Amino acid sequence: MATTPINGHATKSPSLDAAEARRLKHNHADVVIIGAGVLGCALAVALGRQGRSVILLEASLKEPDRIVGELLQPGGVQALEKLGLRDCLEGIDSIPVKGYYVSYFNDPVPIPYPKPTPASPPPEGRCFHHGRFVMKLREAAMACPNVSVVETKATDLVTCSHTQQVLGVECTSKDNVRACYFGHLTVVADGYASKFRKQHHPHTPKVSSRFWGLELIDTKLPMPYYGHVLLSDNAPILLYQIGTHETRILVDIPENLPSASVKNGGVKSHMRNVVLPSLPESVQPAFIAALEQGQLRSMPNSFLPAATNTTPGLVILGDALNMRHPLTGGGMTVAFNDVVTLRNLLSPEKVPNLGDTKRVMKQLSTFHWERKKAASVINILAQALYSLFAADNQYLRALQRGCFRYFQLGLVDGPAGLLGGLIQKPSVLFVHFFSVALLSLWVLLREYPPYLFPVALFKCIMTFWTACVVIFPYMLIEAFC
């Protein structure tokens, strides 16, 4: 064979054997998925358990090694439970996450995830090594009788020249043998650097900064089981434990930052001279050790609004479809919620035959708007919070001070619920954001003596205008695009 199928099978029926033969001998299935990452594996299992025949394509089935996709919010854990995949969080040395620890110039505030009811157990997220989690999801896909996992590199989409409908995927194996895989529906889930996005997505990712990451060994965090956000005069720093002995640190470095320029010694010099002094003392020894080992890696921080699918036979999902700044760790939560939504919309009860292109297209149009119930809050919050936490002018810094003061007053349940993917109401985000803005104005007014009231008033107007500029563009994108 041109490619290497890897399958796990339960008790088979004759019809299942026929479907498997169709996948393996004729390279044909109901659904072909490009990318056996977080979303691709979850979708393959979800559709396979509905009785759909699925071919899952992945260029390399080796364990991936990434510095993002390591924090799953409680809302993502809940979506994983709906998919019957929560056990994928076990056996990978994952660490419970109970909320956030925000430090503003070394003044900390804990922000626990809110309980649904006083008698309920507190919601819990998980941190882990990304690769270990993906391998567990791949095991689940391989164990699904209706799914065939094939290690091969997708190179192009097979398209009907008359109707422009996508019919399948052209691939090349490690032995450089070409093959095509056909399905009624082709799913592109090949990540942030998608090679198929450009032809079928109207938007281009916008990169504002990069996260530079190190893995710290046996460091002591100020507040275990909490994601740490460190705020200062510099861009935000994230810390969270991903294993018994490992802690991830991500340092946001905006583009063209002078202290990280080659002239000033590059990123490593920025880490040593700017980042190190701002870290908690308990973290500094492990940070120095990791920095000396030279394990610095980076990922772009991108923003990409979603777009309605218009190509028959194709759906783009995951980071190939929609990205937001990873500051809030919401990417996988959006992905799993998307899988839940799409699974429900494409269920055999609603779409008996995925070859019914007209009905599938109608459901995909519905999917674009239905997914926003979970995705919009996370997308808007990620972009707005990054603007505040990476404040680079006096008005954004005023909003940053107001935001931290808001947390200090104990008004954390709403923000924590939004961050955790537990509250999926944009109206709640709107109320909290402008409550922060109004509190920022009060804090700003108190910083000036009465005789400078005209100056303070002008700065209040500019600060409120800045708040509107921060959030309204993203709210409009989510509402109308």
Swiss-Prot record:
<keyword id="KW-0503">Monooxygenase</keyword>
<feature type="transmembrane region" description="Helical">
    <location>
        <begin position="28"/>
        <end position="48"/>
    </location>
</feature>
<feature type="transmembrane region" description="Helical">
    <location>
        <begin position="452"/>
        <end position="472"/>
    </location>
</feature>
<keyword id="KW-1133">Transmembrane helix</keyword>
<feature type="binding site">
    <location>
        <position position="332"/>
    </location>
    <ligand>
        <name>FAD</name>
    </ligand>
</feature>
<keyword id="KW-0492">Microsome</keyword>
<keyword id="KW-0472">Membrane</keyword>
<keyword id="KW-0443">Lipid metabolism</keyword>
<dbReference type="GO" id="GO:0004506">
    <property type="term" value="F:squalene monooxygenase activity"/>
</dbReference>
<protein>
    <recommendedName>
        <fullName>Squalene epoxidase erg1</fullName>
        <ecNumber>1.14.14.17</ecNumber>
    </recommendedName>
</protein>
<keyword id="KW-0560">Oxidoreductase</keyword>
<dbReference type="GO" id="GO:0050660">
    <property type="term" value="F:flavin adenine dinucleotide binding"/>
</dbReference>
<keyword id="KW-0274">FAD</keyword>
<dbReference type="GO" id="GO:0006696">
    <property type="term" value="P:ergosterol biosynthetic process"/>
</dbReference>
<keyword id="KW-0753">Steroid metabolism</keyword>
<keyword id="KW-0285">Flavoprotein</keyword>
<keyword id="KW-0756">Sterol biosynthesis</keyword>
<comment type="function">
    <text>Squalene epoxidase; part of the third module of ergosterol biosynthesis pathway that includes the late steps of the pathway. Erg1 catalyzes the epoxidation of squalene into 2,3-epoxysqualene. The third module or late pathway involves the ergosterol synthesis itself through consecutive reactions that mainly occur in the endoplasmic reticulum (ER) membrane. Firstly, the squalene synthase erg9 catalyzes the condensation of 2 farnesyl pyrophosphate moieties to form squalene, which is the precursor of all steroids.</text>
</comment>
<dbReference type="Pfam" id="PF08491">
    <property type="entry name" value="SE"/>
</dbReference>
<dbReference type="InterPro" id="IPR013698">
    <property type="entry name" value="Squalene_epoxidase"/>
</dbReference>
<feature type="binding site">
    <location>
        <position position="138"/>
    </location>
    <ligand>
        <name>FAD</name>
    </ligand>
</feature>
<dbReference type="GO" id="GO:0005783">
    <property type="term" value="C:endoplasmic reticulum"/>
</dbReference>
<keyword id="KW-1207">Sterol metabolism</keyword>
<keyword id="KW-0256">Endoplasmic reticulum</keyword>
<keyword id="KW-0444">Lipid biosynthesis</keyword>
<comment type="similarity">
    <text>Belongs to the squalene monooxygenase family.</text>
</comment>
<feature type="binding site">
    <location>
        <begin position="58"/>
        <end position="59"/>
    </location>
    <ligand>
        <name>FAD</name>
    </ligand>
</feature>
<dbReference type="InterPro" id="IPR036188">
    <property type="entry name" value="FAD/NAD-bd_sf"/>
</dbReference>
<keyword id="KW-0752">Steroid biosynthesis</keyword>
<feature type="binding site">
    <location>
        <position position="319"/>
    </location>
    <ligand>
        <name>FAD</name>
    </ligand>
</feature>
<feature type="glycosylation site" description="N-linked (GlcNAc...) asparagine">
    <location>
        <position position="146"/>
    </location>
</feature>
<feature type="site" description="Important for enzyme activity">
    <location>
        <position position="100"/>
    </location>
</feature>
<feature type="binding site">
    <location>
        <begin position="38"/>
        <end position="39"/>
    </location>
    <ligand>
        <name>FAD</name>
    </ligand>
</feature>
<dbReference type="InterPro" id="IPR040125">
    <property type="entry name" value="Squalene_monox"/>
</dbReference>
<comment type="pathway">
    <text>Steroid metabolism; ergosterol biosynthesis.</text>
</comment>
<feature type="transmembrane region" description="Helical">
    <location>
        <begin position="425"/>
        <end position="445"/>
    </location>
</feature>
<keyword id="KW-0812">Transmembrane</keyword>
<keyword id="KW-0325">Glycoprotein</keyword>
<dbReference type="GO" id="GO:0005789">
    <property type="term" value="C:endoplasmic reticulum membrane"/>
</dbReference>
<feature type="binding site">
    <location>
        <position position="66"/>
    </location>
    <ligand>
        <name>FAD</name>
    </ligand>
</feature>
